[in-house]
């Protein structure tokens, strides 16, 4: 709606969405659902024929550090160390600094990869397990993110995902901007 109020045509908006958004979904069915939802949302504003760049690919296998994104919004998979295969554990240990020690969760690698995919001044908002702020094995991750962390929105106690009991929070991050204060908000 904002782009329309600025006088941009539906065609121009559709082209911009096609060129400036990239997404990753490893599950083909979920990828298709994502595109359908995006199309429905755009249709509400009269925007059609967006050629979505939603890749059916593992984000961690993509050369994300080459993206230099302005914004990253995500909800990484919540897979515990216990639920990973030995092959997955070894891959993450070899490729991600925050996964070299202890019993890391899969989402730690996503957070590191996303930070590396940001350009300087780029911002990230991730919906993450709240346990990251308490878990002993998340210490390396906390060290990694603390410099650019701008805020935490604590959703503990909220039923964010139907049928799933997991306390979550939004992590707000800005690359290259060290903060002496971090916004903390409870919902």
Please state what every model-predicted region is.
Residues 16-19, 49-51:
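Short Gly/Ser/Thr- and Asp/Glu-enriched loop/turn motifs at secondary-structure junctions
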């Amino acid at each position: 709606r904002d782009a329309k109020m600025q006088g941009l045509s539906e065609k121009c908006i559709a082209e911009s969405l096609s060129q400036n958004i990239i997404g990753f979904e490893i599950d083909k069915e979920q990828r298709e659902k994502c595109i359908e939802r995006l199309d429905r949302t755009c249709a509400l504003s009269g925007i059609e024929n967006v050629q979505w760049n939603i890749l059916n690919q593992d984000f961690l296998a993509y050369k994300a550090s080459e993206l230099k994104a302005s914004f990253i919004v995500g909800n990484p998979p919540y897979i515990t160390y216990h639920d990973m295969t030995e092959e997955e554990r070894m891959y993450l240990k070899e490729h991600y600094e925050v996964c070299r020690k202890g019993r890391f969760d899969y989402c730690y690698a996503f957070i590191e990869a996303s930070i590396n995919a940001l350009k300087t001044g780029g911002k990230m908002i991730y919906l993450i397990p709240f346990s990251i702020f308490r878990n002993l094995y998340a210490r390396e991750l906390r060290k990694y993110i603390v410099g650019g962390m701008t805020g935490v929105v604590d959703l503990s106690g909220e039923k964010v995902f139907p049928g799933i009991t997991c306390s979550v929070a939004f992590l707000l991050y800005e690359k290259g901007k060290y903060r002496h204060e971090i916004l903390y908000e409870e919902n």
